[in-house]
Every structure is written in C-alpha cells, then in structure tokens.
Amino acid sequence: IKGLQCIVDIDDALHLGVKQAALNVTLDQLVNWRADSGRFSRQIDGETVYFHSDYVEHIDSQLKRLTDAGVVNSLIIYNRIPGSRVGSPLVHPYTDLAKSPFHVGAFNLATEEGVRMYRGAIEFLADRYSNPRREHGLAKRFIIGNEIQSHWHWYNLGEMPHRQVVEEYHRALRVAHLAAHSIHPGIQLFISLDHHWSAQMGENTLHGMSGKYFVETLNTIAKAEGNFDWHVAFHPYPENLFNPRTWEDTAATPSFDAAKITFKNIEMLPAFLRHKRFLHNGKARRVILSEQGFHS
C-alpha cells in the first residue's frame, strides 16, 4: 500500500496512487490559548478551549480531498516550539526551550490548564474528523508525539531519566486515548518510534533510550494502571540515513535484541509485539510504517 507523509501537493499525491496519508497537526498552531472568543471551540470542564480558524480550515481542506479520494488518513499530533513560549500552557515545564535541537517539545500534562488545552485539542480533532458523515474529512488514526524514545530531539522533556520519560509520555497517551474514545471508540492511538531498537540515539542516557526499553516500560505502566489499546507507528529508516541499500544494514539482525529495526528485519517488530504480555484483549498491537525515507 503506497503512503505519503508531509504532503505538499495533494494532486501529486493522488496521481501517485497514494492510499494512505499522514498529516502533521501541531498543537501550537491548532490551539489558540490566548483567545477568549473564536469560531472553533470546545468546552472542557466548564472552560472554553479555542482553536485557530485558519489552521482548522487548512486541515479540513487537506483531509476532505484525501478522504473523498479514498485515502486512509492518520494525524501526527505533536508540539512544535518555533520560538519562545513564555506563559504558554502548551509547553511542558521540563521542556528545554533553549537547547531543544528541533524545537519539538512534550505535551504539557503537568498543569491543570495544560491538560485542559491538550484534552480539548484531542476531543476537537476526534469530533471533527471521526464523524461518519465525513463532512470535513476522515482520520481515525492519531499518532501521539514523534519518535518518543529519542525524546531530547523529538519530544523534548529536558534531560530526564528513562523511566520518568515513559511515565510522562504514558500520561499524554492515556489522556489522548480517553479523550478520543469519549467521542469515537474506533479511533486508534499510536505511539511513535524511530529505528533504534536495543540501541539508542547518541550516548547521553538522559537524552534518549532504546525503543525496546520504551515499549516494554510503557506496556508495564499501562497494564498497572489499566490496559488499553495503543498501537505502534514505526519509522524503519535504513541504518545509515544516507545509504538506501537497507539490505546492507549490519545492525538490523533477525533478533529481538537487534540494535536497529529497519526494512531488512522489519518482521521482528510485529513478532515481538505478538508476545502474550503485549496483547490487549487477546489481540496484538497494530503496526503502521508512518515515516521512512532517505537523505541525499
């Protein structure tokens, strides 16, 4: 099945025969946290969360065309921090605004206002884009964050121990699950992982962890607090991002302890998730390949 992410030209995508698409939704562009009025809003615990109308209309225009063409759509929901966000309830208090390499931070589930804004955003997206009438387009896959095990780069929580990172992310994932399923129980929630499996990106253990540790720890925490149906959006980039010959990947071995999982050994991921301890109601977690490519 042919898929495309970060679609620039929908006509081109449809001419390519794309059947699946992943669209980025950035929380800071969606939530108008300074507003006290607006066209788009949602009530959360007696408070009103407002949304930027131009951004909502932008999502509508993309999703509607793709949906009408029969494309299955996913939303990648993440927290971009393009500049200073002093006072923003969207920014996690542990996010290192100055040093975040790619200006992508964690969702703020540490304050009451942050939870309200985040929950409002998820409920709004679920309500608008899971409606069977498909008036604004259809997207029933929500990918929460980006490449979480390499959090320093793509879900910045500052310098933080592994277990605490997973606990923080679990909170965001569970709130998203509860919020989305309060609107439509058919929405699927996905975690996001890069190709590092038993290895981690870089050497600083406060900047990242292995994908295997992240999945195992998330599963343990989720089961302890009440299991739910999360799934995996995986990025099977080649071992060397500048070498598309993935069959030459030496770190992608046929083992559950492989340093990396790429297209060469991609079968290891669904096989690992079929272990009994990862099942939910007797069913294995779904795996989608939501991002992959090559540098040039």
Where do the model's predicted regions map?
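N-terminal substrate-binding region of glycoside hydrolase catalytic domains
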Residues: 1-130, 134-137, 141-144, 148-161, ...
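Noncatalytic carbohydrate-binding groove/subsite architecture in carbohydrate-active enzymes
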Residues: 69, 115-127, 132, 138, ...
